[in-house]
């Protein structure tokens, strides 16, 4: 039996369902294309309660996380949320995650649903005695509100001044009367928030359901189909598809998460060795002239095999096929032309560094008068 | 007729792979069913054979793609393609809006229709098949 989130009662009546990471989740409510464009042009809401949420608390919390991730932790102020990676001893990516710093020694770690168990085991294996790592996945719900209309959609439900909450900041607040943690983060490339509703279990889903239904009055409910096409259009890698334990941050084009000069974290020695030379392959974007690339499709350069597509879709904004892929050094220069083999024929494509959309028109940096 | 919200016109022939075929004079018009279109959810790309290309019954003759998925289209009958619905290049969503009308894919001049039509389903047969499929 797949697990369900606190909001399953809403999805089961209205959405086409799919199993993902052991959870029965909404794939789409209307169409993926319509939900995608609702987020780019107005605002959409996503049930992301399946994601893993771990509370890390106690005197040793900061020291523990500092030794666990390549990002600086101690110097982050409370109220900051930051993107980082869990690495294995070889510098390979166990997962990507967001850490929300609630207090000097208090954190909420938000991880991919598919990796939650492996992440917990990795953290427990490295944790000092006396440190509390508490799985809050089942006792909280999580809703993402994303799009240029996200501020106005969420502001109706809270006294927290969302205009004052900058990107990658978080604050505890009441949302629709429920105690919650609000962070200005997301996985769509748009402005928006992720709201973690406290005290929400499968037995007592009412508070989370109230938050969701109030948001649904002004935002479009979106399924995992749109979540995937939106993150891909923004160029965000999905762990398990676009990177795994055999990929290091240099190859994944995520070297920016490694704090300059930081040493002594899990995987740092391996990264020092691999960072000294250019990676043999690197993550890039592809825009196709025709056709839709999919996971596993081969990429050909002038000199033959150049790489492989790790995720691909149709971009509703560009109205073209787009992909994330890994390319060998000789073919990875943005602007290069390569071919993607689709059912036996090579389709021409351009190498890019995502996001795929024009940032003047879409995404959180967009010009406001658009 | 209609089975659980999926429209099945009475006057078409069907395959178990969810294509339909209809005689239009000397040619046979081919498309995908309402069920196939709704299962794909949002058709965004169509790859059909070219005019004069040969298609063979039960063999792939192209693909219909949504944002998330690729679906092969199998030729319900054999023959030579005489017309392609070029409007789908710019408006693939017509397959969702009107799978049996404006969303048709190709017209084929059949090479062996009398024999091949025996392996196609009528509307009642396809409806019964769809019902067993939806019970699973």
Give the location of each predicted region.
Chain B
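Acidic, low-complexity mobile loops and tails
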Residues: 1-57, 97-98, 102-112, 118-136
């Amino acid at each position: 039996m797949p697990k369900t989130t606190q909001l399953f009662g809403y999805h089961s009546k209205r959405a086409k369902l799919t199993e993902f990471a052991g959870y029965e989740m909404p794939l789409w409510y209307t169409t993926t294309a319509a939900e995608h464009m609702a987020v780019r042009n107005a605002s959409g809401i996503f049930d992301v309660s399946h994601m893993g949420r771990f509370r890390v608390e106690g005197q040793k919390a900061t020291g523990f996380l500092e030794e666990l991730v390549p990002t600086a932790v101690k110097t982050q102020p409370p109220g900051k949320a930051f993107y980082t990676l869990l690495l294995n001893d070889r510098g390979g990516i166990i997962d990507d995650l967001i850490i929300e710093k609630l207090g000097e020694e208090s954190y909420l770690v938000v991880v991919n649903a598919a990796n939650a168990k492996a992440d917990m085991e990795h953290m427990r294996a490295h944790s000092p005695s006396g440190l509390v790592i508490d799985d809050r996945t089942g006792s909280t719900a999580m809703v993402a509100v994303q799009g240029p209309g996200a501020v106005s959609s969420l502001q109706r439900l809270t006294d927290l001044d969302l205009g004052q909450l900058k990107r990658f900041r978080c604050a505890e607040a009441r949302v629709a009367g429920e105690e919650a943690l609000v962070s200005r983060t997301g996985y769509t490339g748009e402005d928006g928030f992720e709201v973690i509703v406290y005290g929400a279990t499968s037995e007592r889903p009412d508070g989370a359901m109230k938050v969701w239904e109030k948001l649904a009055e002004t935002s479009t409910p979106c399924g995992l189909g749109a979540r995937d096409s939106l993150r891909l259009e923004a160029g965000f890698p999905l762990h398990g598809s676009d990177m795994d334990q055999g990929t290091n941050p240099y190859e994944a084009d995520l070297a920016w998460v490694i704090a300059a000069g930081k040493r002594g974290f899990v995987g740092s020695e391996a990264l020092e060795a691999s960072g000294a030379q250019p990676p043999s392959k690197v993550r890039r974007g592809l825009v196709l002239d025709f056709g839709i690339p999919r996971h596993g499709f081969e990429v050909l350069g002038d000199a033959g095999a150049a790489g492989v597509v790790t995720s691909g879709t149709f971009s509703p904004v560009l109205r073209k096929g787009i992909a994330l892929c890994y390319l060998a050094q000789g073919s990875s220069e943005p602007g290069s032309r390569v071919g993607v083999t689709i059912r036996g024929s090579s389709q021409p494509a351009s190498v890019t560094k995502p996001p795929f959309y024009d940032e003047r028109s879409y995404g959180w940096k967009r010009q406001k008068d658009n | 007729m209609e089975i659980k919200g999926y429209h099945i016109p009475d006057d078409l022939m069907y395959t178990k792979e969810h294509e339909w075929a209809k005689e239009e004079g000397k040619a046979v018009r081919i498309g995908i069913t309402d069920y196939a279109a709704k299962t794909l959810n949002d058709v965004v790309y169509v790859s059909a054979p070219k005019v004069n290309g040969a298609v063979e019954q039960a063999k792939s003759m192209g693909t219909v793609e949504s944002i998330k998925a690729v679906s092969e289209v199998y030729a319900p009958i054999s023959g030579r393609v005489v017309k392609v619905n070029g409007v789908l290049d710019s408006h693939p969503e017509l397959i969702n809006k009107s799978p049996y009308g404006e969303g048709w894919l190709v017209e084929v001049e059949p090479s062996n229709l009398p024999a091949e039509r025996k392996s196609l389903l009528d509307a009642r047969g396809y409806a019964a098949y769809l019902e067993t499929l939806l019970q699973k």
